């Protein structure tokens, strides 16, 4: 996918899919910058990943534009930007119970965050560079309690298509994960996380739910494939067929 001459910035790189992507890029020889809000979590991620000569961590909240602008001043030149960050805590609720502040935080992290990354990061990308974001199955298979996340994912995919045109020849794509066993599921299902994932695994044609590495592999593919832009790559075990 990449080599030691390529520089990859991963927003959300301290856990879950972003951490798996950081590991994948490091294994491929890239120089990696992981970004997150929590400095302690970033430090733990760096310990897990190793590779101190090719890995650095920068703290920033991508839902705040001034922090994104500062982030890219510190990051320097890049080849690829990827974003797996999402703050959906409290955003899964029936409408009468929905905390609108939580809904706004979710929109800020998954729509405005990518918009800020593109606005301030595109100029830092080398020719042939790419931006890759993560939407999700909720845009295609919404469920009760999931209205906010369904709308956010659909909005992000619209943004990806528009940015692919506006920022060309830079490439802009999205990966749409299905149900993936990552820490974010604690915010979705709470104590029922394991039960919910096992139930979904029985429904899916693939016979299992996703792993963080499945999404990392898909993002790595989009980084490498120079003839793919404005595309949503579905990595969901056949969920849209189930």
Predicted regions span which residues?
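Catalytic Tyr-x(3-8)-Lys segment
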Residues: 193-214
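Catalytic loop of short-chain dehydrogenase/reductase
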Residues: 87, 97-100, 104-107, 111, ...
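C-terminal substrate-recognition "lid" of short-chain dehydrogenase/reductases
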Residues: 208-235, 240
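Rossmann-fold cofactor-recognition segment
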Residues: 49-66
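Substrate-binding pocket helix/loop in short-chain dehydrogenase/reductase
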Residues: 92-95, 99-104, 196, 200
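Conserved Rossmann-fold SDR core element
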Residues: 157, 166-182, 228-235
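Conserved glycine-rich cofactor-binding loop
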Residues: 14-16
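Conserved glycine-rich Rossmann-like NAD(P)H-binding loop of the short-chain dehydrogenase/reductase
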Residues: 28-44
